Amino acid sequence: MSVFLSNWDIQSINLWLSKMHHYKDTSKSQRANESYIILQLTYQKIGNGRHRIVFDLNNGYVLKVALTKKGIQCNETEFKIYNHCRADLRKHLCRVKEVGHGWIIMKKMDIKVPVEISNKELNPLKNKFSDAGIKPRDMGNSNIRLSKKGKITVVDYGNFIMY
């Protein structure tokens, strides 16, 4: 049951998850293309990485669907870290709204971080996560956005490690 997704959407995701192992040895673009065909979701695809494909739900939120087993782990990691980290760190993490097996729904954030802000604030923010027992792996310009309040927000923290 989902507030954001229809039963058909969830069935489509489950179908993809049952077939994704067939594509484990393909390139990330081939895997993303195959998932898009099998998923047949009505949402616009806005991107993909090695482990997940991202769709715009057109309501201020995005849907991330796993492309690999590691993608499933990334979704679980984002859910766990968002719900178990300190509040002062949570304000720098993209909000998780809903999660299911192989998928996660998060707030859509699309304001790119200007280089001058990134250069000044990214390393201190990485240190803040590290000091709190969270290793911020893969935290770079492609995985951060600016909140409406001007705060750096990590939109992809599936590779973070919580100690």
Give short role names for the model-derived ranges.
Residues 135-163:
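Catalytic activation segment of kinase domains across protein kinase-like and atypical kinase folds
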Residues 127-134:
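Protein kinase catalytic-loop region centered on the HRD/HxD motif
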Residues 2-44:
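Juxta-kinase regulatory segment immediately upstream of eukaryotic protein kinase catalytic domains
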